[in-house]
Amino acid sequence: MVNLTKLLITCVLSYCFLFADNNSPYVMVLGTAQDGGAPHAGCVKNCCSDKWGSSGKQFRVSCLGIVDPKTKEVWMIDATPDFPQQLNELTQNGKYKLRGIFLTHAHIGHYTGLIHLGREVMGAKEIPVYVMPRLKHFIESNGPWNQLISLKQIILNPLEDHGIVKLNDNLSVTPFTVPHRDEYSETGGFQVSGLTSKLMFIPDIDKWDKWEQNIREVIKDN
């Protein structure tokens, strides 16, 4: 099923970037569904039945793209099972350069798209992948993900809670943690900041009242 909370929060918090002028950084909402997309594998309920065989009714897994039209650079937040289509849309069929991928956590809808960077598919070279400490350890300790490291197809860049990452002169990203099922890694969200605007992207969280932040105040501040 589609996670309507993801859709609402993504759309509301993206407002300031989506209506930027042609030369300003902006974001692309590349997906809004939970880990398995919609329709889900094995789903025969009404929420899925009309989506099988109809690509126009299908929903891709939650993913956000960051675009700087001045530098022709793009970044992704999360590498989903829909990575091929989302990458192509974000880079405009290769016209823009993928400069990095930020991962939120180790649930299948948020990191398994990395497999397409391997030698069986893209054979990528040193794509920066930004990860929090537990997620970094998970990728380093488990195949096939650690093969991406050994073959230098990805370069892991460690993140710190609320540590600012400068992407270029126009953009920065700040990670933070949120409460969620953390079986294999912590769960993060990201604040994306431009020169005049910023937004916050939280694709997964258990409950807003479990977070030490007040979501209403966060929206006001972003």
What kind of feature is each model-predicted range?
Residues D68-Y130:
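Active-site metal-binding motif and surrounding structural segment of the metallo-beta-lactamase
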